[in-house]
């Protein structure tokens, strides 16, 4: 029997530079853009863990802590926090990374992901 993957094996970081097209009317990063980036990271974490295509089934928590602005470097860090029979919980913490390398948290989210079989149905089978 093959040993399952550890959460560390599916850890994912993604980096975005905020540009003017990403801003809302208040010249801050549009929340919907950040949520889209978060969803992508959650999907990559779950896919790496399960070895399958995945889908988002729920957002358990999504907290906007601080704003981000044009030219900010956004770092999204995703890690697996729970694995059930068919679902996985992924925690994504988003930061603004400053030129000196320090990071300030701007968002924390928990997404529930499900691995899919060939018929796009939830499956407990891990590859």
Predicted regions and their residues:
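Hot-dog-fold acyl-thioester-processing enzymes
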Residues: 2-58, 113-127
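HotDog/MaoC-like acyl-thioester-processing domains
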Residues: 2-13, 69-70, 81-127
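Short, well-ordered turn and helix-capping elements at secondary-structure junctions
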Residues: 18-22, 59-66, 96-98
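Conserved interaction-surface patches within small, structured recognition/assembly domains
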Residues: 57-67, 75-80
């Amino acid at each position: 029997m093959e040993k399952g993957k550890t959460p560390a094996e599916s850890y994912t970081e993604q980096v975005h530079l905020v540009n003017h097209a990403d801003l809302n009317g208040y010249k801050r990063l549009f929340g919907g853009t950040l949520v889209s980036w978060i969803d992508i990271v959650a999907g990559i974490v779950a896919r790496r863990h399960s070895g399958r295509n995945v889908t988002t089934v729920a957002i358990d928590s999504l907290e906007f802590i601080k704003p981000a602005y044009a030219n900010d470097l956004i770092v999204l860090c995703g890690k697996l926090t729970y694995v059930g029979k068919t679902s996985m919980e992924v925690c994504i913490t988003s930061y603004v990374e400053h030129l000196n390398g320090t990071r300030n948290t701007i968002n924390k989210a928990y997404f529930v992901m499900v691995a899919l079989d060939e018929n796009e149905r939830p499956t407990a089978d891990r590859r």
